């Protein structure tokens, strides 16, 4: 668990995901990713087109290995917090805001004698209930950074700007 950190929906592969994967001829990671998105946001999976998977990445703090599954939300539907034990906010952030160099810096957190640094994105969510400003950092920011680099969308930003990672959202 990475409480307080902005993150994409996700979690472990459940045993029933394997059966669905075999039935549908779809990779198990994709089945699990859609199931988690439904469980955590109420997303209608029929409106999502799976584009592919990124290479598996280590999650250093918890020693998990994560395979990000990328999807295009082709037919957006209403989403929201389904379980407050899992999520506090479902935020929709425009990609242009994530790419804006003014919204980027390097976040760091010290654990003992080790300092961990990750890319970070300052973002604003303006929902029907409130305007919320927060920092996307850690694993989620690393994934976003890798996606933008792979797509050659990254706009040069000053990675030497260091800010402490927030304690929570």
Language-model region placement:
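A conserved hydrophobic position in a structured secondary element of the catalytic/binding core
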Residues: 8, 93, 139
């Amino acid at each position: 668990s990475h409480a307080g950190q902005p993150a994409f929906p996700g979690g472990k592969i459940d045993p029933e995901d394997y059966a669905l994967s075999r039935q549908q001829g779809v990779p198990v990671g994709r089945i699990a990713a859609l199931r988690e998105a439904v469980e955590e946001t109420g997303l209608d999976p029929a409106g999502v087109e799976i584009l592919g998977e990124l290479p598996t990445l280590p999650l250093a703090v918890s020693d998990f290995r994560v395979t990000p599954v990328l999807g295009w939300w082709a037919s957006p539907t209403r989403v929201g917090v389904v379980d407050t034990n899992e999520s506090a906010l479902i935020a929709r952030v425009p990609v242009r805001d994530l790419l804006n160099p003014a919204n980027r810096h390097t976040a760091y957190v010290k654990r003992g004698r080790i300092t961990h640094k990750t890319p970070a994105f300052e973002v604003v969510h303006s929902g029907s209930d409130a305007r919320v400003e927060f920092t996307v950092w850690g694993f989620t920011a690393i994934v976003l950074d890798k996606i933008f680099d792979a797509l050659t969308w990254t706009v040069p930003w000053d990675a030497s700007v260091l800010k402490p990672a927030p304690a929570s959202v």
